[in-house]
Amino acid sequence: HFGRVDVLFNNAGIGAPAVPLETLSPAQWRAVVDTNLNGPFFCTQAAFRVMKAQTPRGGRIINNGSVSAHAPRPMTMPYTATKHAMTGLTKAASLDGRAWDIACGQIDIGNAMTEMARPMAEGILQADGRVASEPTIDVALVAQAVLDMARLPLSANVQFMTLMATKMPLVGRG
């Protein structure tokens, strides 16, 4: 409608069943990779084309990473691998976009209360084998953080931000 792309927020993400690695099917692996990595790549590629050609040129890309980009949960290899890869996508897009005034950053979210995080509040497998509930944060806090990143002038960038519940287990997942 307006002929511009000023902000892209790559926010899609799914997990696979929390099962031992050897029982994960190729289809389950591919579904997570297609949604969590290939989708953001192709959206970023399309945004780059528009952002380079528009006047004034440039724009901002914000990727939804995860605290799983830093530390895995038990039996979440597909999700964890794609979120680590998202960090690489963010860094590469940030570097490649610099000459075109395209800023790219990543927000790593931990336990924002969505349908995906509901099991965490109810009780989820921990690194030590226990099942424990984890604290969550209101999604409005995440929305505000993304808006704050989006509102920056293109001369400034939040490269990485982690937003999580203060008492959420993260380092070592314990």
Model regions: which residues?
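Active-site helix of classical SDR
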Residues: 44, 82
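C-terminal helical subdomain
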Residues: 106-107, 125-172
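Active-site loop immediately N-terminal to the catalytic Tyr-X3-Lys motif
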Residues: 22, 71-77, 134
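Residue(s) in the substrate-gating loop at a strand-loop-helix junction
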Residues: 66
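Substrate-binding pocket helix/loop in short-chain dehydrogenase/reductase
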Residues: 19-21, 28-30
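Alpha-helical segment proximal to the catalytic Tyr-Lys
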Residues: 49, 95-98
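A short helix-coil junction within the Rossmann-fold of NAD(P)-dependent oxidoreductases
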Residues: 1-2, 15, 19, 46-58
